[in-house]
């Protein structure tokens, strides 16, 4: 079979039903949609995802980032008519994924046994904060809480200070990357065996895997992790150093003898570099306070870009600490085609023209670049914009029926 016989997109022909808010689940759908799957995002105007409230209305940063390339529809599954429409969609979908609690799904009448009855070979994915079993499974969880429970924050922060929060939902993003891999795996299994599958995923576990070294250290030695700020037990100098400019910094890591020689060359090999206190990694680790002061005195007179360039040219790992401007205007991500200009299409022209016409948003690409089936980033549509396509073309509903269910707020 020639390559032309395969679909252009890696997941073309796969239909996925997504029901749930926040970051991890929409991130999963975003990745699968970019790879060609038809991801139908089920929402309702009655209870909006918090991402809609990041300014501006319905165009907040979270929306173009997580909802692009999806088919966005409105169904209130809590209504009898809405529930029936949702069940019809289940019958024509390959995957159903959600992050609602099971007791909520049970109350709505879309528990997993019922979904499997509607489509016996459907793949079911349930994502929670802490998982579906275990002593904490009923606990409420949210971003920062799961981050701390996962253990990474215990290692973050300065010596003698409280654990430091990483100010982004990194566990959600990890989960959003792990879940597409699992879904593609069970899709392949179903193709090979014809058998369906269910999976359960937790944000807690996705965060805990990044604390692996601390877990292994405790298991083998009984040691607890220590907070050491930006330092590293196997490198010196190792830290983030202030540079010329407003809140400009550069990260530097010197691990090997060759890197230390390159570092000395890059900074002009001042006399202090020849002191016995800095002759070996062990001695540099023992004298880090003074070493950091000396390195910081050198970086303070240079731009972060110059520090990075000079050290890298001498074989020393170094990087500026990027601000938003660096990420957006920097040459490397542009060369990687990381940013996408995403147009805003709006079917509902009841909004004032000045609010919508000509609007575009910038969103990030998925990190992998596929050579033969490039990612499809589509456009950013408004909530409910794809109602006609899904209800009329996929489900074959009439204009009259769609209008009736919209008026009684089942499709709202």
Predicted regions and their residues:
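A short glycine-threonine-serine/GTX helix/turn-capping micro-motif
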Residues: 163-174, 196-198, 228-229, 236-238, ...
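N-terminal helix-loop segment corresponding to the beta1-alpha1 unit
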Residues: 1-195, 227, 353-355, 382, ...
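A glycine-rich dinucleotide-binding beta-alpha-beta segment and adjacent secondary-structure elements
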Residues: 314-374
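Oxidoreductase and adenylate-handling cofactor-binding alpha/beta cores
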Residues: 176-197, 209, 213-221, 264-271
């Amino acid at each position: 079979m020639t390559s032309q016989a395969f679909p252009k997109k890696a997941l073309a022909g796969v239909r996925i039903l997504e029901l749930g808010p926040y970051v991890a689940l929409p991130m999963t759908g975003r990745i699968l949609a970019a790879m060609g799957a038809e991801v139908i995002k089920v929402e309702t105007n009655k209870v909006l995802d918090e991402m809609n409230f990041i300014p501006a209305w319905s165009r907040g940063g979270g929306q173009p980032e997580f909802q692009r390339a999806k088919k966005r529809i409105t169904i209130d599954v809590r209504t009898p008519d809405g529930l029936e429409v949702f069940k019809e969609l289940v019958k024509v979908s390959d995957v159903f994924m959600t992050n609602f609690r099971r007791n909520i799904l049970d109350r709505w009448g879309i528990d997993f046994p019922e979904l499997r009855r509607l489509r016996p070979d459907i793949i079911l994915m349930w994502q929670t904060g802490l998982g579906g079993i275990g002593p904490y499974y009923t606990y409420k969880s949210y971003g920062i809480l799961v981050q701390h429970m996962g253990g990474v924050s215990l290692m973050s922060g300065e010596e003698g200070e409280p654990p430091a929060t990483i100010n982004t939902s990194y566990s959600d993003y990890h989960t959003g990357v792990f879940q597409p891999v699992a879904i593609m795996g069970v899709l392949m299994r179903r193709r090979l065996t014809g058998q369906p599958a269910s999976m359960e995923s937790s944000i807690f576990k996705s965060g805990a895997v990044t604390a692996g070294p601390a877990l292994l250290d405790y298991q083998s030695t009984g040691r607890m992790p220590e907070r050491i700020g930006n330092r590293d037990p196997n490198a010196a100098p190792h830290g983030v150093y202030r540079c010329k400019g407003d809140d400009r910094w550069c990260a530097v890591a010197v691990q090997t003898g060759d890197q230390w020689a390159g570092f000395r060359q890059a900074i002009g090999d001042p006399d202090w570099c020849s002191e016995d206190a800095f002759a070996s990694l062990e001695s540099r680790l023992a004298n880090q306070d003074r070493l950091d002061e000396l390195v910081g005195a050198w970086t303070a007179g240079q731009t972060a870009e110059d520090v990075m360039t000079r050290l890298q040219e001498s074989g020393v790992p170094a990087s500026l600490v990027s601000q938003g401007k660096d990420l957006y205007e920097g040459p490397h991500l542009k060369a990687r085609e990381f940013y996408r200009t995403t147009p805003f299409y709006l079917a509902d022209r009841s909004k004032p023209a000045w609010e919508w016409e000509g609007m575009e948003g910038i969103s990030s690409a998925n990190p992998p670049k596929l050579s033969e089936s490039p990612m499809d980033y589509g456009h950013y549509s408004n909530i409910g914009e794809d109602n006609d396509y899904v209800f009329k073309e996929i489900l074959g509903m009439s204009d009259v029926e769609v209008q009736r269910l919209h008026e009684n707020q089942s499709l709202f």
